[in-house]
Structures are given as C-alpha cells and as structure tokens.
C-alpha cells in the first residue's frame, strides 16, 4: 500500500469476495450474507489490512451488501424465511441472490445489531 500511496491512492477498498467460510465467495453463486472473513484469503484478518493501510497513510473501506443473501449461504440455510417471498409467485433470483426482508425485526437485529 505504500507504493499505492506514492501514486496518489488515498483509500484502499476491500471489495466483494472477502467473506464466507462454509461456502466461500468465489463467484456470485455463494456466500453472500455470511459476513465472516474467509480465513484462506485473509489469514491475518481485516484488522491487519486496516493497520497496513493506516501505516501507509491510506484510508480503509470495505464492501458489504447486507440486504442480500445467496441461497447457498449459511445465513439462508438457517433462516430461509428471512428472504422476501411473494405468495403465488415463483422465486426470482437476481444474480443468484434474494433480498432480505428488512421489515422483519429479526432480520433488522441481524443486519443492524
């Protein structure tokens, strides 16, 4: 990151793919909703990256999409009822994902808690 700082980079953004262990995020088919660091990809965790960025004088940001879930995720396995389902309609998967029902207090606690 020090080299990036010298090039004028002022923020490091950790994008999609840093999360999920049972179903690691390798593509858009799995892992969304399991917001735990993938140990294989980041063995030192996110705090290490934050410190490296700080030491280099670069801000740190991280991508999340807390309102979405992949059917192939631990979250969906445990709580399939948390995804929005419309009665008498076929389930629609946009990019292999579903929208969590943020009107559900349990979902709110999970996302914002």
Where do the model's predicted regions map?
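Aromatic-lined carbohydrate-binding/catalytic grooves of carbohydrate-active enzymes
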Residues: 1-113
């Amino acid at each position: 990151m020090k080299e990036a700082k010298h090039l004028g980079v002022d923020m490091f953004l950790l994008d999609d793919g840093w999360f999920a262990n049972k179903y690691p995020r390798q593509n858009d088919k799995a892992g969304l909703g399991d917001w735990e660091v993938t140990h294989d990809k980041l063995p030192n965790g996110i705090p290490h990256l934050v410190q490296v960025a700080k030491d280099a004088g670069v801000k740190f940001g991280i991508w999340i999409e807390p309102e979405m879930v992949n059917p192939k995720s631990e979250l969906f396995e445990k709580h399939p009822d948390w995804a929005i389902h419309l009665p008498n309609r076929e389930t629609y998967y946009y990019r292999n994902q579903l929208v969590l029902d943020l009107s559900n207090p349990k979902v709110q606690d999970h996302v914002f808690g």
